Amino acid sequence: MSSVSTRTLVLRALGELLPHKAIPPTSLELSLALGCTSEELNNAFIETFTLPTDETLHYLSSEYLAKTISPLTGRQDVTLIHSRRQEAREYAFRYNFYETYAGELMLASTERGLCVSLCTFMDRSGALERIEQEFHPKALIQSTSAFHDEALCHLTSLGKRASLPPLHLFGTPFQCGVWEAMLHIPSGRCCHYQDLATLVGKPRGAQAVGTAVGANPLAPFIPCHRVLPRTDTLGDYYWGSALKALVLLPELISSPLY
């Protein structure tokens, strides 16, 4: 099975997950829903995650996810530059497209750091249009960047070894505070929205924090995929719960709790 068709089958399977269900479906249930054999599905999951379907999806059960909730103590060692959104007009954005285990990403950076990461879903013109509409940069220049290379190395290491490049954040002070707070979540571990709210000094502001999490411009490098609802289920994700699972699972599997 080609890497593209393998990813397609895995994404279709992950798309069958209900974001707020405590127990994931079984391999048999998924193969029946997808019209494939359990063997085909297991082979796709082993190629993607190194484990067969049922063992992989156990990591997304609420029983397991509850154990991953981690105190927000140390933060990743990364340089952060905070700017208001309207200041993006003062910068040229250098962008390019990169194939990753999570699909094609469009990365963009200013002269100061990585500023945008978008899942293109193979719609490059749509990704460019979104950057134009949201940031109105002074210029968009297709080019590689050392910031992009550092970010991709970090992603390949599942956030464990390679450091992040400087991150140039365009947002309100509150948004930037929430985005910075997510850098306290270790790879292979998760937190609740309420935990982030407490960390940024807004213990009753979980809903506002959730909105800021959803506006994260640098997923998966700022790891909003590690934030869960109080029910300890997968929860929602701007790019869809299937992609959240695709990004989160390799981290959970590489840092097992048993």
Where do the protein language model's features map onto the residues?
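Short glycine/serine-rich loop segments
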Residues: 204-246
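Basic nucleic-acid-binding alpha-helical/helix-turn surface characteristic of O6-alkylguanine DNA
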Residues: 1-204, 251-258
